[in-house]
Amino acid sequence: MVELIKVPKIEQEEGNADSHGKEKADVVHEEKTEKVKRRRKRVSDPQRKKACVDCTKRCIRIHGMASSSSEKARPTPTLPSFFKIMVGYFSENMDIPLPFARTITDMTGSNVYLEDAYGLRWRVRLYLHDDVLSFGHGWKNFVLDHDISVGEFLVFRQIARSVFTVQIFAISACERIHLCERNKRQSRKRKPGRKTGYPANNQMVKVSSKDVVKRRKKQRTDEQIYDLDPRQHDMPVRVCIDSGSEQRCSESSVKELDAAPDKSHAVVQVPATECNADPSYNAAGMKTIKNLEAIGASSSTKDVTWDANKSEDYPSFSYPESSNVMTADKESERSHQDRPMQLYCELGLEDGNAETENCENSNVLENAELRTPLAMMDLNEVGIDDIFLSADIYEFDSDFCSPEAFSVDVNTEGLVSNGRTPGDCFGVPETSRCLENKQMTDVPRTSTDDGSIAVHGIDINALPSNTYPDIGQGNTYPDIDAAPDDCKKDKDVLHSECNKVAQKAHSSVKQDITKDGPRQIAAEIMSSDPKTCELTYVRKNSVQPGISSVSQWNNSKGQESGGTKSCVVLAVAANSKKFCITIPPPDQTWLELPRRLPVLPRTKKQARKILILKDPSMRLWPVLYQCTPKFNGFIAGWADISRENNLREGDTCEFELCSNSELSFQVLVPNLQ
């Protein structure tokens, strides 16, 4: 019995021990789970997150430190601040309240910085405006960058001597945090431009990869403009003068000539010793070649960079012996200026209608830039605004085209010439060997000659884009009686060239009409046959700023009696764009046009432009032209023209575009003529 009682007691004790052990294990497990939960809670608790250093400093500067629980803690001082409600014209400047302005009067004329919610700063100048301190230069950029509108509430706090923080509150009374990128003009510094020039002593210059990419892009653009084949595009020919020769061409006189697409020429630099010994070398140190066949033989060779010590013999080219080149002893400067034109004659780069052999007896124009021929320029490209688009382009400082040699009467039927290339002013590619004739000759012309075109105000856009005016070549319009025999045969060439110019101008009109669309074609009224015109004269135009040189009409008595009208624009008779409009009621100050006007380079297609209208009395009137999808016409200035010309409702006005380079119209009133 005693043994049986002991056994249950032992089991009971073991059971109690096991229960105590389980309880302890449960307590330990619960403690571990609580620790894990606390750790997770610390990580996910948003109140435990810490702000970055910049945000903390900015918050402390604006709102101050958090108040401590101790009563002895010093209260945080409030920053000086003021607010402004955006009303009225606030975009240009903003007035600072007078009580706050008194504290910063010593900062007048200095710059302060406005800092937004993201820490970006804008520099603004303080200035006095009507005895009131205001934010001036730079405030407009801050308003535009943050898109501040009328009715918004701005709070300015001065956190430093010249730094203000700005809080923007929208109309909804909530703070608006506008994220704006830093302006490019503030973050980027202007890089100094690299000066480029010709290397001295034929030294090689290192070219970066960026320059190579830019040159390739420019080359592709030139190929698209001039329709050149990239495979036929060669490097320009350079004329190098030996450093050991007596005359040394300056860097500014060295010209780069565009070689023909199907030829490449080699430029050879000749040592000074060989140049002095051999009489076949000219004063420039270049070996002369008697015929052009030697140049064609060297077309397979490429441009070679020469060294002074090399003794290889490569074919070279220079100016022909028969060309009119001045000696270096008399006029060295003119000889340097004559070389580029002579190279043009030798390479055959003139117009296709002009023969190369005629270039041998040509005189070269002084002080003329021949890097790119004028008539070969594309007048529709972007950079065409850099040249003058008027007759003044052909009038240089020299006595090449003297204005006193021409007549000054509008109805003159003859052309007065001094034998010094008046044909260059007309852009007619006629060549002549009569260069020594300095006498005044009269050429009778009538207004009934077919193909002849009268000239008073030259329109450069009417010149053919692929024609090179032989500047420096003595082109003259021959006289049947006074001119020599070798000039008489060129009479027919003039008429044929004028017909070609008119045909090209007429074809360009058709291309413009196809671009305008069927809507504009239906509204356009223009004559298909060119008017009969006469070759008159060219006089020096004094063009005022803002007024283009417009063509003038012959309003003589013979015209009023039924005579034919004489157009005075070069090759614009077939290219003139005309349309007729019936005069609206006198109380209508605007005038709607039936078609859109052409778009000038560097101008928007739909915008406002100032045009110049010329009435029958040769008075110029500026009008404001507006082009929108729904309206196309004059919105200002037409009322004055209608009133001064006594136009009545129902009269017909004929508008004619006189120049494509500058928008200028001429108003013709048939009822008044």
From Swiss-Prot:
Pfam families: B3 (PF02362)
Main location: nucleus
Keyword terms of this UniProt record: DNA-binding, Nucleus, Repeat, Transcription, Transcription regulation
GO MF entries: DNA binding
Known DNA-binding region: 79-172, 576-671
Biased composition (Basic and acidic residues): 1-34, 328-337
Record has Cell membrane as a keyword: no
Segments of this protein annotated with the region Disordered: 1-44, 315-337
SMART domains registered for this protein in UniProt: B3
GO cellular component: nucleus
Annotated localization: Nucleus
Protein name: B3 domain-containing protein Os01g0905400
Origin species: Oryza sativa subsp. japonica (Rice)
